[in-house]
Amino acid sequence: TMRVLLSLTMLGYSSWVDLKTRELSDMVWLVFGGLGLIIAVYEVYAGSLSLVWFVAVVLLSAALSLTFSFIGLFWGADALAFITLAILHPFYPKGLEPLFGIISPFFPLTLFSNSVLAGASYSLILLVRNLALPLQDRSLFSGLEHEPIWRKLVVLVTGLRVGIRSVRGP
């Protein structure tokens, strides 16, 4: 329960700060990762967590995160968030039953794949929103009529038209 509460607090806070400022201090990951390590040390001492499996899962998650970051699929905060989640949730939370009864031995990978699916679903939300703009007498492409159709299709699922004043600049 404590791990889930810490994760929800961490993700809620980091999402809120990201939306407000687009910048997030590395201290967030250090604090929550540190708290996760304290819990892990206690659980290893109490005999409810295998040190070998915990270290293996965290190291594998860190290697995967840093690889994704190195090849450009992650940014720094994404990699740190994934590593921190691996520390907080090295294994499936007890008491929460999976929908299909299948539990991955590498739970952080499950978290990652679910976040990829959630991120992809955001593209569907953007598509519906952008297709509805003409119904509101607004245009996504005003001033961009000369752009090729393929670029407009990409913008339909990835773009969000906002006023210049709402974008934080340097």
Regions found by a protein language model. Give the residues of each.
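A membrane-topology feature that recognizes alpha-helical transmembrane segments
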Residues: T1-P170
